[in-house]
């Protein structure tokens, strides 16, 4: 079907490009449709057939077959290389040979783990127009979960924009609800949500009237121009000015919330002698944490809170008012209903492990079951927003398409993470396109991608630990469970579970939130509710691991569920990423440490049952062991120290053949990488940044994670990973100020040492070539060694810019400094090292002659 014949989708009078039926896979130079006959047959049946809700594409054979051949060829080359090395064992430096051999074997093993799951990349494209044809009036309910903790580390402006973008999403307003979990229990977050509920009465109808994209006001107003898709272009300018003015006032109120609450509390405390409480606007104590900590009102010790800020709307549209003095924006033809909005802060008590984000998600899962009980759940981090207003419709294409296409067996749909405000060169590989568009896309050909923590739609019953329908109906499985021991003692919550198993149902809110419901909600948010249950193990998000997202997805895959990796244009969701070097390193430290925790736990992929696809098992094994190989990379990067303490060294003899093997296997992996760049649709810059940041992590962060894990195994104590802090551009006035800020931490030291060693090794190599001549054996060996050193320094180039701080804006300074350092080391070697090495060589030769004479004895 050509683009000219695309079917138009109108929702609230809006044209959405995401809703066109794209069927041009055959025209793509990389991807080809695999279900073309199915699609064409359904659409050519005079309306009797129903087209599928998504289309599937595979990589063309002209790319896939050479790609697979190269993988096989490199595997053969690696085996031949190992066999050759064993036959030519270096006995002069046995310890070095043994160490490098073990490292190379692990390199080969980890490469196989990484490469095998990539053999059949599949792309699945949702057809939102087909969804509208088949489910125009019966889309199922969705509960949207948003998590946040600290309004400082996670700026509150991000959170309010996330909530506003969700409230304005293009989905039936009476069929989804939004829940915010504030794990800090702060009044600032609660009153920010009160402000959001008020501003949404203006923002959401404005979005519907003019079909604006994106629907996060901060990002929308930051855009310079965009195509107009609404139906009243003549009113856009005046409405835009009015709404923007209101938004700026809204931001002022949000920014001043902390001081406003403090001033109010000071006034109330002055009236109540001896009190130092934090007061709400209605003159009552805030039940959460106070500015001045007190008993039952501090971090880690406060009551649970559930507040419905926006009630569930009616099923019938409610049109707004015409323009007037009180209502300057004309919403007379616009549905002004708002989705349900709920604020949650779970109870915290000393002596309980609250399990961070996973614990908060499980509380929201229980509370939402009582208040809305939608059969599908989407979760967001507090700094991710809805970038494509139809983002909630896209995953439904995969969840609702049965027809033998696996929809009913799909546990979750994962969208790639896309980021704003990353520096143009993506210095620290924040976009991570190689992982999202390469690795995750390739898993679509197996059981599906892993769960990545945000931008994910779940089937509620899959979170409850129910197995996929191929092993029995969900309702039957739930009835057969030991419900009290598995899910807890709340009969109200248990009563919602069978309804949650019906994927076709909409939201059915409680008629009245009376005292009995309030009591149930308090019980569900209590610390003790999960005692003696399966929450955090077989039910909900998994506990006691830093990467609870990956392990939660793994639990579903091992039960036989499938997942889907879906990408739409424009991107469904966008968020923020840490552009500061230290924060980025701490982020990947948490990820790598959590991966190792997964390997050394009952969630090890080797322990999964037969329902886990063999190559999916390999993929999870790779995800949980990748930091281990970096220990060998770290020591390889320190090998240049040998240039500083000896005249020459050999890892393997004969060196010439060793070098040929090495060049061959390295060249092949880069050619394979180019094929992946092609089918993943990424740029060479993306690939290069991925290579560079992998080396940066391998020289400090990943070995540190291995050390942490070793200490945990020895001592039995858990690992604490700090929350990645994010800063708004407005806080400093410079969009990329964090990029040039140096935060010195011990985590930087190993990589700095590696850089110093390799710069010194380059200097020694230059000195050797100058002292002995580039054509002599010491000279040309020095030049070859220098190639390795320079390659390491090129990979560590982004790190070097990061530790330079403001000087990183002038890369020329780095090159000049390195050139001067190399020249200084080379000069010192020529002046002191070369004569010393010559003297040692002379002494060694003399000793050799004496030894030979003593062995042969006197002649005659």
UniProtKB/Swiss-Prot annotation:
Keywords: Cell wall biogenesis/degradation, Coiled coil, Glycosyltransferase, Golgi apparatus, Membrane, Transferase, Transmembrane, Transmembrane helix. SUPFAM superfamilies: Nucleotide-diphospho-sugar transferases. Residues 235-263 form a coiled coil. One of its GO terms (biological process) is cell wall organization. It is a multi-pass membrane protein. The keyword Glycosyltransferase applies. Pfam families: Cellulose_synt. It is an enzyme of class 2 (transferase). Belongs to the glycosyltransferase 2 family. Plant cellulose synthase-like F subfamily. May catalyze both beta-1,3 and beta-1,4 glycosidic linkage on beta-D-glucan. Essential for (1,3;1,4)-beta-D-glucans synthesis in grasses and cereals (Poaceae). The mixed-linked glucans (which are not present in walls of dicotyledons or most other monocotyledonous plants) are particularly important constituents of the walls of the starchy endosperm and aleurone cells of cereal grains such as oats, wheat, rice and barley. They can account for up to 70% by weight of the wall. This is Putative mixed-linked glucan synthase 1.
